[in-house]
């Protein structure tokens, strides 16, 4: 499997300690610069208010399968958490689009570190992406 980045994040977060635990916990503004060869994929993106950004957490540890989540005392498998430490460190954030200028998007709520490769952008659709209640799910 080969993933090709479509762009790069310009972020105020330089290290993992700078970044919020979740992007929604910060109003910091970041920029997503889409590479020229993918810029046409942004056609009409100015009509959207929110998007899903998938990015590669290139500074995250890839050798952990168990972690202790913040606020907890017991280990859990990484697939039951939102930890950046995981075999394939793919980050996912729903962000608010603040401004679009050619191949650059200014966004809020992105927790990616500066220089993180962007691997995909998708339309956020509340009817599909927002689950109000999951029966039987434990916190």
Swiss-Prot record:
Instruction: Write the signal peptide boundaries.
Output: none
Q: Which PROSITE patterns match?
A: TSAA_1, TSAA_2
Database matches in SUPFAM superfamilies = YaeB-like
Checking Pfam families in the record gives: TrmO_N
Kindly list the positions annotated as binding S-adenosyl-L-methionine. 16, 20-22, 58-59, 82, 92, 113-116
Q: What are the entry keywords? A: S-adenosyl-L-methionine
- Name which cysteines form disulfide bonds: none
TsaA-like domain span:
3-133
Subunit description = Homodimer.
Matching entries from PANTHER family are given as: TRNA (ADENINE(37)-N6)-METHYLTRANSFERASE
What family is this protein classified in? Belongs to the tRNA methyltransferase O family.
Q: List the protein's name.
A: S-adenosyl-L-methionine-binding protein AF_0241
The opening ranks of the lineage are: Archaea, Methanobacteriati, Methanobacteriota, Archaeoglobi, Archaeoglobales
């Amino acid at each position: 499997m080969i993933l090709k980045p479509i762009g790069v994040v310009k972020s105020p977060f330089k290290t993992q300690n700078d970044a919020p635990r979740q992007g929604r916990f910060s109003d910091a503004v970041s920029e997503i610069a889409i590479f020229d060869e993918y810029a046409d994929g942004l056609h009409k993106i100015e009509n959207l208010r929110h998007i899903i950004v998938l990015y590669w957490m290139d500074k995250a540890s890839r050798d952990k399968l168990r972690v202790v989540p913040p606020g907890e005392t017991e280990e859990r498998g990484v697939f039951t958490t939102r930890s950046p430490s995981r075999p394939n460190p793919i980050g996912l954030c729903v962000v608010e689009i603040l401004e679009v200028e050619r191949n650059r998007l200014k966004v809020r709520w992105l927790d990616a570190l500066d220089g993180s490769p962007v691997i995909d952008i998708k339309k956020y659709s509340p009817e599909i992406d927002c689950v109000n209640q999951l029966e039987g799910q434990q916190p």
